Regions:
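Class I S-adenosyl-L-methionine
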Residues: 1-112, 206-219
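Short hydrophobic alpha-helical segments that form membrane-spanning helices or hydrophobic packing faces
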Residues: 19, 120-124, 171-172
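Short, well-ordered alpha-helical microsegments
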Residues: 38-41, 118, 148, 168-169
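Short hydrophobic/aromatic-enriched beta-strand-loop microsegments
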Residues: 49-55, 106-110, 129-135, 181-188
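Class I SAM-dependent methyltransferase SAM-binding "motif I" and its flanking Rossmann-like core
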Residues: 88-156, 198-201
Length: 244
């Protein structure tokens, strides 16, 4: 019986993985990886067997029960299995179900955190998610329910919505229904954490204007305090400028 390590690969480029994550990935015999992880991560574990268990929105996807079963199967055959997840395993990553599957079969596990897309978007645009005095709370929300219904909330000073890129116009309507004024600041970042990240600034009422720019790209939408510029001077760098 082996051990499973869940590793957050970060939301984009391979160098966003943590040092601990890279070290443990290098020790893997088998790697079950998500669709949005950087192929360059294979360089950390070139001798491991890599198994694609990715989910792709509106395309081919490995079912969650199939992933759970495969994870258990591989852990029963190998000493060290890595479950490589995009972003952070604990944020909208179905981690609970996979942990439960392992626990049911008495398989040991540990979890290594990673950078989630909301944080990568905040870093890329230099827009902190929390602000002193007017941005004291943050909510990370999937815009799609388990039944595929679009939802929006107003429960925090900054709301970050995942998986909303295909329905920005509808999200705008839901946000205003939830109590966000139409002129509230909103920020859309697609492929956050990658060199080709795209950024657009809007008011909530005009979010539909971003659909063409971000079409076909995984995007996060930040609304409220964390969407506003942190620097108000006219010489601040563009959000699209390369950043280390």
């Amino acid at each position: 019986m082996g051990r499973v390590t869940f590793i957050g690969a970060g939301p984009g480029s391979a160098d966003l993985i943590t040092l601990r994550g890279a070290k443990l990935l290098a020790q893997a015999q088998v790697v079950l990886f998500d669709a949005l992880t950087d192929p360059a991560l294979r360089e950390y574990a070139p001798l491991a067997r890599w198994v694609d268990v990715g989910k792709r929105g509106f395309g081919h996807a490995t079912s969650q029960p199939a992933i759970n079963a495969l994870l258990v199967h591989e852990a029963q055959l190998s000493e060290h299995v890595v479950r490589l997840k995009g972003g952070d395993p604990s944020v909208l990553g179905r981690l609970e179900e996979e942990l439960q599957a392992l626990a049911t079969h008495g398989i040991a596990y540990d979890v290594v955190p990673g950078v989630t897309a909301a944080l990568a978007a905040a870093a890329h645009t230099a827009r902190p998610l929390t602000r002193r005095g007017h941005g004291r709370s943050v909510s990370l929300t999937t815009a799609m329910t388990q039944l595929g219904v679009l939802q929006a909330t107003r429960t925090a000073d900054t709301e970050v919505f995942y998986m909303a890129g295909r329905q920005l116009g509808a999200l705008a309507s839901k946000l205003m229904q939830a109590g966000w004024p139409a002129d509230t600041a909103a920020l859309v970042v697609s492929r956050a954490g990658w060199p080709d990240a795209r950024v657009s600034e809007h008011e909530v009422g005009q979010l539909a204007d971003a659909e063409t720019l971000h079409a076909g790209r995984p995007a996060v939408v930040t609304v409220g305090a964390g969407a506003m510029p942190a620097v108000q001077t006219g010489d601040k760098p563009s959000p699209d400028d390369p950043r280390p």
